């Protein structure tokens, strides 16, 4: 597995949109995304001015079914 990229929340949201995820709603500084192909699965993305922490990014990618290489390609 390659190293996770450093990415901000807004860029991660745009990358996930390319994979079929959509913004369901926002709650404060967090965006909740869903995918029609994966009912019941939601991803919560923090949208702050800093990059998403590696552990958080790893969990987001795991829920989305994406690898580090795939997210680098999408960003």
Which residues are covered by each model-predicted region?
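C-terminal structural segments of small proteins and small subunits
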Residues: 50-75
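Residue-level preference for alpha-helix termini and adjacent loops
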Residues: 3-6, 44, 51, 73
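A short, structured beta-strand/loop element
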Residues: 23-59
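N-terminal first-folded block
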Residues: 1-27, 36
């Amino acid at each position: 597995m390659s190293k996770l990229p450093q990415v901000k929340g807004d860029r991660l949201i745009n990358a996930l949109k390319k994979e079929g995820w959509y913004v369901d709603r926002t709650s404060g500084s967090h965006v909740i995304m869903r995918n029609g192909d994966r009912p019941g699965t939601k991803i919560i993305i923090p949208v702050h001015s800093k990059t998403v922490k590696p552990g958080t990014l790893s969990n987001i990618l795991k829920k989305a079914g994406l690898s580090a290489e795939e997210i680098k390609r999408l960003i």
